Amino acid sequence: MTEVYDFDRSSWDTKGSLAPILPTTYPDGRLIPQVRVIDPGLGDRKDECFMYIFLLGIIEDNDDLGPPIGRSFGSLPLGVGRTAARPEELLKEATLLDIVVRRTASVKEQLVFYNNTPLHVLTPWRKVLTNGSVFSANQVCNAVNLIPLDTAQRFRVVYMSITRLSDDGCYRIPRGMFDFRCKNALAFNILVTIQVEGDFCSNRGNLSMFKDQQATFMVHIGNFSRKKNQAYSADYCKLKIEKMGLVFALGGIGGTSLHIRCTGKMSKTLNAQLGFKKILCYPLMEINEDLNRMLWRLECKIVRIQAVLQPSVPQEFRIYNDVIISDDQGLFKIL
């Protein structure tokens, strides 16, 4: 049995929205570079120079003989760096980068990025830019099938999204808890409904994910479990959730991210599951990459958040990560 409880609007009203990046052009039709700054935190970190940078741009032919042919809209996550440079300075240098893009494959299709331009204000992000980086193509590219192999490609930066990391302490991305299951436990999930504004019809993707310009995604927080082989009631778990004093915000980690901060009391078991951290970050790039790509530069805001309590999936249930499912005859060999 699934039980659903609504959080009060005050838990996300302050920072539960993201401003759009509205395209503007020069007289010749070229896009004017823009930077967006997001601060999903409470501002209690003493040093405010830490930030996460996410680049958006166009993957196009690297051909000096004529106007470049744009192949697809893409992104390049640079990660966390520390700098006192102004956002405009960071954007200016990013637009001057010579970022080469190459299409390849491993378990999934991938895109390789590396920069050939000397760095100045972007030096804190040299690990990704200078040493090169490889990402899952579906996470960073709208249409990887349109990227050719016989023509050199470059990534031309058009937009920059900066997320200030102003919360005191570190951010926990609880990957290790996603597959944790326990007998007689109740799984605590969060269902987020967002309202999307803007010209999302121009984005490549599955528009059916929006109903009345709204979309939902769910994240797993942890499990409520007792030491003895007994289960908590849903009403008791609701009281525990209310005592946690959860505050929600939207950030720009990996494109769009959900930030959750516990301002109250957390149960010892759940606290241990989360590594004794009370600031959680869920990048939509890892949770729902299709929705994340649709939201890259659109305006979105939280309109509803619900706590979802469900029985934890039994331990005997197997998790299948591929389409082979089960091959008892030994006809498929996984290398």
Swiss-Prot record:
GO terms for biological process: virion assembly. It comes from the Viruses. One of its GO terms (molecular function) is structural constituent of virion. It is found in: Virion. The keyword DNA-binding does not apply. InterPro entries: Matrix_C (IPR042539), Matrix_N (IPR042540), Matrix_Paramyxo_C (IPR055413), Matrix_Paramyxo_N (IPR000982). Its main location: virion. It holds the Pfam family Matrix_Paramyxo_C. GO terms for cellular component: viral envelope. The M protein has a crucial role in virus assembly and interacts with the RNP complex as well as with the viral membrane. Belongs to the morbillivirus/respirovirus/rubulavirus M protein family. This is Matrix protein.
